[in-house]
Every structure is written in C-alpha cells, then in structure tokens.
Amino acid sequence: MSPAPPPCGFAEAESTNTKSAPKFRSACNACHEVKLKCLGGQPCARCRNKQVECVYSHAARIGKPKGSRNKKTLERLRQAKAMSRPEETQGEETTSLTAVDASQAINCRALSGSTRRDSSPLPPPHSDTDSAEGGAEEELLDQEERDEAEKPPLVENPPNLNPLEQISPPREDFLDLLAHSSLLNNTQHDLQHPTADMVPDGLAGFPHASTSAADDLSWMTSPTKSLLSTTFPAIEDDLQDLQDPFLCSSWRSACLPPSSSRSSFHFPRFNHFAEDTMGLEYASGMDATRSLGDPPHAMARAGSFSTSGPGSSQEGSHFLSSRHSQSSGMYQPVPKRPSCSCLKLQASALCRIHLVDRSHADMRGDTVLATASTILDSCNALILCPSCATDYKFLLLAIMTVRILLCWLRGLSATRTQNDNANMKLTLGEYEISGEEEAIIKNMLVSRALEKVKIAVRRLRERVNSITIQEVGNCSESTQRWDLTYIRMCLDHMEKQVGC
C-alpha cells in the first residue's frame, strides 16, 4: 500500500518553506573558482580526487529585488500625476454647467426642432413596428440634443475679426475693372512699338513717349481712376500731376525707353545724380572687358569713356581723378621678379642627354661635342643669372648634367673604336685630314671641351661658396644644409676628375 498523503495544511506549509528556501549553486566553490564543470555530488569527483572540502554556496540573485523602482521611474510617475491633476480639474469645470443654462439650451433646441417639424412635409403612414423604432430613434435624438446642450456655445464671429463680407472687395468695382480690359490688350501697341517687350506687364498699355501731350490720360478711364484713388489714396496727387503736359512727358519717358535708344532705359529724374557720380558709360563692350585688368591700365582708358549731359565732361574728369586718388593707396602694383629661362634651359639639356644616351650604344665624338656645347651654354647662363644662381634646385640640375658630360668626355678620350674612326671624317675645304693629323685634331677638340667643363666646375664652386644658409619659403634650414652638403660633395668629386 502506498503511504498516505500528508495533511493539507502540512503540504501548504512545506511548499511555502521550499519556495522561501534559498537555492544552492550547481557547482561547488572549488569548481566555480577555476571555472570548471562540476559533476555534482557530495563531495564531487574533483574534490574527492584532490581531497579538498566540497562546499556548495547559495546562488547569487541576479538583478534588483522585486518591488524596487528606479529614481527616474518614481520621478516620471510623479510628473504624470502632476500633469493629470489640472486636466481633471479643467474637465470638471467645463462639464459643470448651471441648471439655468442647460434649461435654456434645451428650450432653444426644442423650439428649433418644432419649427423644423412644422416646415417639413408630413411623413408617410407607418406600422406599429415603425412607431416602436421611431420612438427609440427619438430617444436617441433627445439624448444627443441633451449632450450637445451641455457643451459650451460656439462664438460665430469673434470680436477681433471682421465678417467675410467686409474683407472681400466690392463686386461692382471688380466687374468694372474687368470690363475695361483695354489695359491688358496691347496687340496694336506691340505692332506700333516693338520695344514693349522690355516693359513690365502692368505698363504695357501706357502711351509711348512719341505721342502728343494732349492724349496723355486717354488710356485711363474714369472707373480706373476712381478705383485707383479708392485703393491707393496717395496716388491721387500723382494723377493730378499727370495733367501737366511737362510732368506727364517726364513720367512717361521715365517709365518707357526713348525712341532714340532702344537698348537701355533712361531716367530723367535721376540725371543730376547720374552726372555727379555714375554718369560715365563705356564706349564699347570691349573697353568694358579690357578695363577689368590692373587699376592703372583701367584709369588710362578714361579717354575712351563718353559722358552725357551738360557739364558732364568736367564732372566726369573730377570723378575719375577722385576715384584714382582714392584707389591709389589701396591698389599698388606688385613688383614681379625678373623672368628668366634658366629652368627651361636646364630641363632641355637634361632631356637631350637622356635622348642621346638611349639612341647611341657607342658614343660618337661629334655627338658628344655637340651635346657638350648645349650643356655648357645652359650652365654658364645659370651661373650668370642673379635670381637663379642661389637656388638649390637649379644648381642640382646643372651639376647633374655636367657630371654626365664629364663621364662621356673621359670615355671618348680613353677609348677609340673602329666605328668611330670610320664615321668621323675630317676635311678642311677640299683637303681631307687623315692619319696623325686627324688624331691630333680630335684630341685637341676633346681637351678643349674638358677645359670648358673645368671652368664651369670652378664657377659653380665659387657660386656655392657665396651661398649662406637662411630660411627661404617653406624650406627649413636643415633641408638647405643637407642640399648644400650634397652639392659640395658632387663638386669635390668632379674637381678630382678634371684636376682642378
């Protein structure tokens, strides 16, 4: 027989004890410290093998205890309660209406409903079911009317706003303006005056400057005048001034281009201002383009400018002189360094050496002598140039070319090939030089070229010795010192070769 189950009360007490009892770790302390899997048991296999005490500690609870809240959560709940309290009080104030207001609203609704029922046609006959449904609908309608009566009444016209009828323009003036559409219809005027495309759309119907003063206001009708005077009160004085023929012609010429010049507008009201300050015009578009150079050149072209108006020549000259005196302190010509072709000569010499070195396997005497003449000429030009002789870049290029030339001349004087002797024929007029005389002349030419190289190396040494270390541009003193040391090493090596 199976044992009898424990009493109900004892089972509940045992379950509560098991729930509240702390749990132990699945691994013992020794295995947990070394992070190894514990097989369990008391003691476990690892503790039994090492003869270590096997102890199981309570499992640490992860996270916060139940029921605890963060400070931010409590603050957020407090703010939510504080925000909900004024809304509740405001809702209570809006919903609490007096009995008198509610009764008045219900009476108004009832009167309006009775008038609607009296004015509406009689409904068709209906059955009992229809009457029952109608009663339910009436109850719903009454409930809706009571709900609407409880709402505060809406203000139809706020006190600070005008009705729509006061804002909209009067219909008579608008139709009158549309009736006189001659202002917009300018087809005939376009045929007579082709320059009407340059005028804005609102001025397309204005008369041209060539018309007489008698029909100055013929284009403006009385409804248009009245509409302009009511809409813009300040323009009424201008309309009165337009009756004067002189003022009307001036205003017309200010709005439209004159017949004599179709390419630019003319403003007679600003003639005095234009003559005093900006009355100068360019004689042609090319002068305007060329005058954008340096200020002295632009001022030298003052004779090509043309002026218009009485006394404009004196005022224009005074304007030019004042502008030139003001700009003389602001714009100063920047002094330019003297231009030279040293860099171009050095680069050409280096390219020539490169081409000769690639095109000839065995250097011929005539080719070496011709190349030597070009290289030595560029080197002498660099030494004599006052602005480039102290630049390390140019000196390095010159030393590079002279070193290559020196190697060619030494090789040409040391070895003589059969191909060289066969191709190099020396003649003096009709006399052909050969044998010992030919060798003497060739040695003399090579020695003369070596002497020129020796002179060039000596001049380069003098130029390098005169250079002082100083900061120039973005080049540091250490970089200049290193370049100067390398240049001196190359010159020492070449001096040993030529025997300086």
UniProtKB/Swiss-Prot annotation:
Q: Which domain of life is it from?
A: Eukaryota
Q: Which GO terms describe its biological process?
A: positive regulation of transcription by RNA polymerase II
Q: What turns on this gene?
A: Expressed during canola infection. Expression is co-regulated with the other genes from the sirodesmin cluster and corresponds with sirodesmin production.
Task: Kindly indicate which segments of the sequence are annotated as binding DNA.
Answer: 28-54
Q: Which UniProt keywords apply?
A: DNA-binding, Metal-binding, Nucleus, Transcription, Transcription regulation, Virulence
User: Which Pfam families does UniProt cross-reference here?
Assistant: Zn_clus
Q: Where is this region: Disordered?
A: 79-168, 302-332
Q: Which PROSITE patterns match?
A: ZN2_CY6_FUNGAL_1 (PS00463), ZN2_CY6_FUNGAL_2 (PS50048)
- The residue ranges flagged as biased composition, category Low complexity, are 154-165, 317-328
Give me the stretches of Acidic residues compositional bias.
135-147
> What do the Gene Ontology cellular component annotations say?
nucleus
The subcellular location is: Nucleus
Q: From the Swiss-Prot or TrEMBL record, give the protein name.
A: C6 finger domain transcription factor sirZ
